[in-house]
Structures are given as structure tokens and as C-alpha cells.
């Protein structure tokens, strides 16, 4: 009976810790982590497209983009790279500091999430010096690496037909995060 009580107590402590981390994430959202972040107009997707790198050995296709100002403002730029059967799509999204757009990411990063299955994993991590997360599915050879820059921009590399997430880390590593953070 005591063992069962301890295990219930331990489960309660873990649940309380999870709720505390969840509340911390919501607090960061409400105040933009500093309390002084207010939504701004997203940058032009053309400005973000200019930051997509050329990568040796990969064919870079024509970038695309879109921007919307209502009901939720955001801007997104994309480009696809191919090498044989492998494909990598880079995306850059400007949330305009709209914390509702960033809620899933902020909570994921705050919680220090990690999950592993027989086919792969998901985890929060550092990506090119930025808070980020990584997913890998070994059965399909698909992966994703994301970085949150300046509490505003999300930089993503999604790969299909690749060997592991190292190549995705390399692609994101070629993005100048200082220039991304300075976009206005």
C-alpha cells in the first residue's frame, strides 16, 4: 500500500511540474517573454527569401512566398532543394510577434519535450544557437528541424528521402540568424 501511495505521490509531483511548465509557457506568450513585445507588421517575404542559402550539390528551386494582414498577420517564404530523390524544403515564417501563432512552439520549447519511438524521435534542442526542435522518422527517412529566432521568426528545414537530420541542421546552419533577427 505504501508503494502505491508513493507512486501516486510521485505521479502527482510530475503532473504539478508539467502544469508549472505549461503555466510558464503561457506567461511567456502573454508577455512575449519580456512583457514588452507587441504585434508588428510582418516583413516582406521577399526579404526572407533573400536569406535562403545556396548549398553545394543541391539544386535550389525558385522561392515562393505569401503575406497576409488579416485576420492574423504573418509572412512566409519557402524554397525547395533537390538532390537525386532527396528533397529539402526550407521555410521562414514571420509571426509579427503575434504570440498566438507561436503558442505551440513556445510551449514545446519551454517544456523540454522529448519522445522516442521504434521509428524515430521528437525533441526540443538548440538549432544554430537558437531554441528549436527536431523530428525524425527512420522508417520514411523524413525529418524536420526548426529554430525560433528572436521570439518572432520560425526557420524550418523539412527533408524527405534523407539519411538523418544532420543535413537539415546543416541547411539551417547556413541561415544567418543575426540577419533574420534584424529583419524589420
Describe each model-derived feature in a short phrase:
Residues 1-40:
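Low-complexity, Pro/Thr/Ser/Glu-rich flexible segments characteristic
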Residues 11, 15-18, 22, 44, ...:
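Stable alpha-helical elements in mature extracytoplasmic
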Residues 19, 26-29, 48-51, 97-102, ...:
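Generic detector of leucine side chains in alpha-helical contexts
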Residues 23, 27-30, 52, 56, ...:
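Generic secondary-structure transition motif, activating predominantly at the C-termini of alpha-helices
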Residues 34-138:
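Short, solvent-exposed recognition patches
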Amino acid at each position: 500500500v505504501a508503494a502505491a501511495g508513493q507512486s501516486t505521490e510521485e505521479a502527482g509531483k510530475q503532473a504539478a511540474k508539467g502544469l508549472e511548465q505549461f503555466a510558464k509557457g503561457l506567461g511567456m506568450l502573454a508577455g512575449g517573454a519580456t512583457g514588452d513585445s507587441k504585434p508588428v507588421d510582418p516583413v516582406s517575404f521577399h526579404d526572407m527569401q533573400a536569406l535562403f542559402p545556396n548549398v553545394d550539390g543541391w539544386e535550389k528551386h525558385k522561392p515562393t512566398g505569401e503575406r497576409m494582414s488579416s485576420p492574423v498577420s504573418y509572412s512566409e517564404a519557402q524554397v525547395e532543394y533537390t538532390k537525386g530523390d532527396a528533397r529539402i524544403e526550407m521555410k521562414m515564417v514571420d509571426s509579427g510577434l503575434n504570440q498566438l501563432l507561436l503558442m505551440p512552439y513556445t510551449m514545446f520549447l519551454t517544456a523540454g519535450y522529448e519522445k522516442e519511438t521504434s521509428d524515430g524521435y521528437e525533441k526540443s534542442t538548440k538549432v544554430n544557437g537558437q531554441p528549436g526542435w527536431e523530428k525524425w522518422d527512420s522508417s520514411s527517412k523524413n525529418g524536420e528541424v526548426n529554430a525560433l529566432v528572436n521570439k518572432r521568426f520560425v526557420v524550418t528545414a523539412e527533408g524527405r528521402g534523407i539519411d538523418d537530420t544532420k543535413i537539415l541542421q546543416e541547411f539551417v546552419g547556413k541561415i544567418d540568424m543575426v540577419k533574420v533577427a534584424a529583419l524589420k
